[in-house]
């Protein structure tokens, strides 16, 4: 197990090195001002302004964010990423709680399920994130701190995958087990707690993974509309300054990457805990 | 045919004039059972046997109060079937063991005791006792998926008997097991239930299984299910591997088989005797 | 249950909920006299949309075109890459951890990077982002389909001494097809979402995302909501097209047998989305 993990990590590093090498290779080979194919600028510019060297990106991390100040940018970016992470986590927890609650209510009252489920499912095909600026506009008017609105949008996006997955999971208990609980004259709520919820866990886990990424993206996008200073906001503002300070943008990208990996690690840990003692799924 | 059933107060299960129709009143009504009268005494081991669709599982579920009859009454332990269920007077076992995959073997056995509100120490000691009874003491901390099919069914039986109920209802519990395991489990079941004098109602579609296990075999006709015959099996209280080779055993098997064939002739249904095993 | 009754049961509850929702919204706005720049009433959204329709439609076309181009290229790249991964294990070992990591990262933040590398005045950066995200969704799902053929089928083909390429054609590809359609049903709305979220990160000033943010910024909220409606319609249209494609390509095929492997996206489809309903 350890060696497998070490091997994967090593391969990951090798893959990163390959990507960096490809980047530098293109810088050497590619046209400075880019090129057009069929009238489309499909070949990217390889100038130092457009594509900084990989080592320049790394080095930029240690330079200050704003000239004249002392704090190196990696600190600032780390701060932004951590802020975004916390908002996304809050959104995930809030949305998850509501999602599970709604799923339970829908499982209990079939009438509600028939009425609401089509909307819940449809919500996953339409871009709810389009509402981010609206939420920001509403939020700007009330006195609550801005980060709560950003978190709320994350919660809103996390809510639906978890609700759908939980509802599906609650219905996945084996019929024999349901009959068994019936034969014990266990009421609906006891059956929920002892049978349906534990049975739902394997189905809920993928839903939670989706919800986590949804929350992160929701938060990042909302930052743009609300001006909350997280990593999304940073990438936008650095991007606007890209012509004068090209490497700076990439520091924000690294920050976002770190944030994503942290969330990913958290979810993997939760999955391991939730699924311990469960049979492994057979894979080919 | 059967002798008239005396209704006694000590009868464990009394089924009186029960009929069961699904989708009653609608064009797709299905008459699963018609006019069932059955009396099961305390300590009896009664098998319900019949072709697929004859309603034997339905009858079991009526006794368990998992469904309600369209007409007629079911009494369990002198109470209504519903009250019996609310009082948790019986244990039930199904073809799929229905164990909770997220609980250890031990905690699976404790489930009915939790629902009865037993304290932790009492639950644990009873669970140990049951594990001993089904000879799985070493596997208490295992997860169900780590056990073989036969072992899982043993856990299911231990769970069904955990609260020492006077009545055990079983719906083809050994149906998914191979022949050797099946015979072994049959012997185990007799040992376990014999010791506690548990009344057992056992649904099966295997003739040898029904004969080996039961004191009486109830034969049902194809749909709509009626009791066409009740065959006494007097192989004695002590049954073992030699029993399977006794002349009386084969004689009883033939008797049941012929009763089933006869039942087929009495029905208005279109099908023959399907779904009954001769193994 | 008759067919009419069944349809009634399915349609009426959501309809009632929908009407109740819109009605309550309208009432709340009027009764509480909520300012229009805060939360417009459905009626005003409707009328503004009517006035603005041609602009919204144009924006839908632009964002839709970006989504479509990205979707097409993404599917092609994803499928091609999955074949390469299947054939060359070395590439598989290198790319997979990268794909897993990229799965976790919100790569939408790369849009400014693309704006920098390509021209920020064309649609190329946005289309590239859509292509990238769609490729990953398709890659993960199709690769799984190519790899995970049932053991029974493999044994059967081996007993016929089938060559690797025959196995590919007769078992792997048909298996992968159903995974492809699963991926498509996820990727289609994701393409729309990615297309217009990319617009939030700067670039040319057209498209639905731009319409939403610019109108919201100047408090023309009803108009902004109009673009939101446009975005929802677009997303729904793409999803329905994907479902239609699946039905046309293989009427008997159901992509419902398995857990989809999902890339990041803002709104994901859980398994329950397939109208066929059944699950693994």
Give the ranges of each region predicted by the language model.
Chain C
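Periplasmic/extracellular loop-to-transmembrane helix junction in inner-membrane transport proteins
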Residues: 3, 31-75
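N-terminal signal-anchor transmembrane alpha helix
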Residues: 8-31
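Short cytoplasmic-facing helical segments at TM-TM junctions of multi-pass membrane proteins
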Residues: 141-180, 209-212
């Amino acid at each position: 197990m350890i060696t497998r993990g070490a091997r994967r990590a090593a391969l990951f590093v090798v893959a990163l090195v390959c990507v960096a090498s490809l980047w530098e290779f293109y810088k050497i080979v590619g046209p400075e001002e880019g090129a057009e194919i069929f009238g489309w600028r499909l070949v990217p510019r390889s100038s130092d302004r457009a594509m900084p060297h990989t080592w320049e990106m790394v080095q930029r991390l240690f330079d200050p964010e704003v000239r004249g100040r002392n704090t190196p940018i990696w600190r600032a970016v780390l701060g932004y990423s951590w802020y975004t992470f916390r908002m996304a986590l809050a959104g995930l927890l809030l949305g998850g709680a509501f999602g599970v609650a709604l799923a339970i209510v829908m499982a209990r009252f079939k009438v509600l399920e028939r009425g609401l489920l089509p909307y819940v499912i449809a919500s996953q095909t339409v871009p709810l994130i389009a509402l981010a600026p609206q939420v920001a506009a509403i939020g700007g008017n009330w006195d609550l701190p801005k980060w709560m609105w950003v978190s709320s949008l994350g919660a809103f996006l996390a809510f639906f995958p978890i609700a759908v997955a939980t509802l599906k999971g609650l219905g996945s208990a084996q019929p024999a087990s349901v009959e068994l609980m019936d034969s014990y004259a266990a009421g609906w709520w006891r059956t929920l707690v002892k049978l349906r919820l534990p049975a739902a866990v394997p189905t809920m886990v993928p839903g939670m993974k989706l919800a986590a990424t949804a929350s992160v993206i929701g938060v990042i996008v909302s930052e743009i509309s609300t001006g909350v200073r997280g990593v999304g906001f940073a990438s936008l503002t650095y991007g606007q300054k890209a012509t004068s300070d090209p490497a700076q943008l990439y520091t924000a990208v690294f920050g976002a990457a770190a944030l994503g990996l942290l969330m990913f690690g958290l979810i993997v840990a939760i999955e391991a805990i939730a699924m311990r003692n469960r049979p492994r799924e057979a894979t080919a | 045919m059967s002798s008239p059933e005396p209704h006694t107060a000590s009868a464990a299960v009394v089924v009186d004039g029960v009929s069961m129709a699904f989708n009653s009143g609608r064009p797709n009504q299905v008459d699963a059972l018609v006019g069932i009268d059955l009396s099961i005494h305390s300590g009896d081991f009664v098998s319900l046997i019949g072709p697929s669709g004859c309603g034997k599982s339905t009858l079991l579920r009526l006794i368990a109060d998992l469904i309600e009859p369209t007409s007629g009454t079911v009494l369990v332990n002198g109470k209504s079937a519903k009250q019996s269920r609310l009082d948790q007077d019986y244990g039930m076992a199904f073809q799929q063991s229905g164990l909770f995959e997220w609980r250890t073997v031990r905690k699976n056995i404790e489930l009915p005791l939790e629902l009865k509100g037993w304290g932790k120490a009492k639950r644990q000691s009873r669970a140990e006792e049951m594990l001993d009874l089904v000879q799985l003491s070493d596997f208490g901390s295992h997860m169900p998926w780590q056990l073989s099919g036969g072992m899982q069914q043993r856990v299911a039986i231990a769970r069904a008997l955990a609260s020492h109920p006077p009545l055990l209802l079983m719906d083809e519990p050994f149906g998914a097991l191979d022949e050797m395991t099946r015979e072994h489990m049959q012997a185990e079941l007799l040992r376990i239930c014999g010791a506690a004098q548990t009344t057992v109602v056992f649904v099966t579609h295997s003739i040898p299984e029904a004969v080996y296990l039961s004191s009486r075999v109830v034969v049902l006709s194809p749909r709509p299910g009626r009791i066409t015959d009740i065959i006494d099996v007097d192989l004695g209280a002590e049954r073992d591997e030699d029993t399977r080779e006794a002349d009386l055993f084969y004689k009883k098997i033939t008797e049941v088989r012929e009763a089933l064939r006869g039942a087929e002739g009495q029905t208005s249904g279109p099908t023959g005797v399907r779904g009954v095993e001769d193994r | 249950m008759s067919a009419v009754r069944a349809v009634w049961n399915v349609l009426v509850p959501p309809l009632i909920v929908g009407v109740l929702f819109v009605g309550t919204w309208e009432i709340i706005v009027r009764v509480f006299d909520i300012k229009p720049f805060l939360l417009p009433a459905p009626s005003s959204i409707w009328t503004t949309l009517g006035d603005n329709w041609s602009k919204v439609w144009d924006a839908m076309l632009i964002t839709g075109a970006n989504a479509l181009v990205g979707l097409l290229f993404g599917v092609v790249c994803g499928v091609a890459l999955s074949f390469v991964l299947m054939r060359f294990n070395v590439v598989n070992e290198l790319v997979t951890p990268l794909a897993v990591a990229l799965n976790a990262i919100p790569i939408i933040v790369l849009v400014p990077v693309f704006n920098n590398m390509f021209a920020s005045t064309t649609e190329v950066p946005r289309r590239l982002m859509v292509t990238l995200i769609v490729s990953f969704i398709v890659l993960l799902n199709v690769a799984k389909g190519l790899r995970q053929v049932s053991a029974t089928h493999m044994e059967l083909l081996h007993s016929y001494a089938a060559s690797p390429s025959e196995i590919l054609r007769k078992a792997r590809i048909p298996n992968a097809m159903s995974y492809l359609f699963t991926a498509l049903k996820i990727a289609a709305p994701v393409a729309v979402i990615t297309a217009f979220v990319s617009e939030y990160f700067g670039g040319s000033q057209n498209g639905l995302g731009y319409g939403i943010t610019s109108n919201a910024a100047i408090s023309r909220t009803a108009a902004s909501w109009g673009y939101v409606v446009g975005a929802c319609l677009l997303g729904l249209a793409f999803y329905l097209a994907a479902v239609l494609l699946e039905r046309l390509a293989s009427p008997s095929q159901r992509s419902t047998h398995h857990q989809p492997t999902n890339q990041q996206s803002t709104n994901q489809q859980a398994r329950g989305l397939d109208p066929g309903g059944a699950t693994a």
